[in-house]
């Protein structure tokens, strides 16, 4: 019987191992500044798991006459022409974009507020319901409880929809109409403590969203079991709900 929990934890272990290997060459003074390394590490992991019909880049997204801020990771369809491409740097029309991710070395309340604000604005410019995530390799202790960060997330109201605060904390936006165990009474972000599984669940949710966007159907059962191996679902590991502000 496959051990899918161990497999998902191995994704976290692999990302942490590569991060630490690079960190051996870069002292603490420069580690926080040099975000590009972390983007490359995560981009490489995504390419290993995403279907060949999509690509991963970095750059900007254009919708009508509006331009996003620079986005760390853009997942886009290969069957759309790009406006510009040079190696991994792209300028993409919004219609081609399936997901965007902001990558952070370590989430603190202040860093999280700014990241959520920027990702929300980029999501509004793109103007479509896509995977919009924030991925942090490390997290300050329970920074998701900070009132200012929670307020920024509540105001995003689902535009930012997946967040990973280190290897153990995963946040996902849920609408009340979605059937699940122990739901909040209004649209909200659920905060889950899932040891060594947050990285894997973040990537799994991205893959699932892209599969649905491309094929209009849910994941096959075998993939669903592999991507979400927590027995009894992750709802048993929910720590909190953050209710959203009505848009």
Residue ranges and their predicted role:
Residues 1-70, 75-247:
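Intrinsically disordered, low-complexity Ser/Thr/Pro/Gly-rich regulatory segments
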């Amino acid at each position: 019987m496959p051990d899918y929990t161990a497999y998902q934890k191995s994704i976290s272990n692999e990302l942490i191992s590569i991060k630490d290997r690079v960190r051996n060459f870069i002292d603490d003074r420069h580690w926080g500044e040099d975000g590009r390394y972390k983007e490359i590490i995560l981009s490489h992991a995504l390419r290993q798991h995403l279907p060949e019909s999509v690509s991963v880049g970095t750059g900007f997204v254009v919708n009508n006459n509006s331009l996003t801020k620079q986005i760390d990771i853009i997942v886009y369809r290969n069957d759309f022409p790009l406006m510009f491409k040079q190696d991994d740097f792209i300028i993409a029309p919004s219609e081609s974009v399936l997901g965007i991710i902001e990558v952070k070395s370590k989430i603190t309340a202040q860093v999280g507020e700014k990241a959520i604000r920027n990702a929300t604005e980029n999501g509004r410019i793109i103007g479509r319901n896509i995977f919009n995530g924030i991925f942090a390799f490390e997290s300050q202790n329970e920074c998701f409880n900070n009132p200012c960060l929670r307020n920024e997330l509540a105001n995003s109201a689902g535009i930012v929809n997946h967040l990973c605060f280190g290897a153990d904390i995963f946040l996902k936006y849920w609408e009340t109409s979605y059937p699940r165990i122990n739901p909040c009474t209004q649209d909200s972000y659920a905060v889950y403590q899932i040891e060594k599984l947050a990285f894997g669940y973040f990537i799994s949710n991205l893959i699932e969203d892209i599969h649905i966007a491309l094929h209009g159907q849910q994941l096959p059962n075998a993939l669903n079991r592999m991507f979400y191996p927590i027995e009894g679902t992750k709802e048993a590991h929910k720590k909190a709900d953050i209710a959203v502000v009505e848009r």
